[in-house]
Amino acid sequence: MSLCGQYRLTRLFVYLGLLIMGGMSAPAAAQDRYVLAFGDSLTAGYGLRSGEGFAPQLEDTLRRNGIRAHVINAGVSGNTAGQGRTRLKWTLDGLKVKPDLAIVALGANDMLRGLPPSRTREDLDAIMAEFKRRDIPVVLAGMFAPPNLGLRYMTEFNSIFPDLARKYGAPLYPFFLAGVVGDPKLNLPDRVHPNFQGVKKMVSGIAPTIIRALQD
C-alpha cells in the first residue's frame, strides 16, 4: 500500500474512532437519595449504640442495594402521633435538602397510652397531608394494637394505617415490628424496644417497600 493509501486509511480509523467515542456517553453517576425516617423511639434507636439504630441500618441496606442513600433520623423517643404532628413543619423547614421519601412510623405510643384511636387517626392524617402538600412521597409504617386493649379499640386502631395509605396513595408496610414483637432474642430487656438484631429484622422487612418507593 502506498504512503498516500496508508494516510487515508489512518484518517478513516481516526474518524470512525471519534464517531464511536462521540456517540458513547459515560454512565450516569448514582444520584444521592434522601430518606426521612419520621417516628418515635423505634426510629430513633432507643437504647442502642451509634450505628445500630433503624436509620443507619436502613441506610446501609439501601447502599448495599445500589442506592446512594442518606437516611435522616427524625425519630424522637416517646412521641405520639400528636407530638409528631406538632414538630413536623419545623422539622421539614430545618432540613438542608428536600427528602425524596419519608417514612412515617408513629402511633405505637398512642396505643401504649390508650389514647383514642380517633385522635391518632386525626394526627396521622394531618401528618400525611403535610407531606403531600410539600410533594414528599411517604411510606406508612403500620402498627397493631394487642388484643388486651379490647376488640373495639383494636379494630379502630388497626384500621387507621390501611385507611390513610389508601387515602393518600401511599405504600403501606402493615406492621413495623413484624417478626420482632414478643421475641426476647430480638428485644432489649424492657421487652418493648428492639435490640440490634431486632432492628436488623425490621429493616430487612421494610427495605423492599422503601426500595420500590425510591424507584417509582
Residue spans of the language-model regions?
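N-terminal secretory signal peptides that target proteins for export/translocation
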Residues: M1-L9
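Position-driven detector of the extreme protein N-terminus
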Residues: S2, G22-S25
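Serine-esterase "nucleophile elbow" of acetyl-processing enzymes
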Residues: A29-N79, R87-K98
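Short, flexible micro-motifs
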Residues: D40-T43, L48-S50, G78-A81, D110, ...
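Alpha-helical cap/lid subdomain in secreted, periplasmic
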Residues: Q57-D60, I67, R85-D216
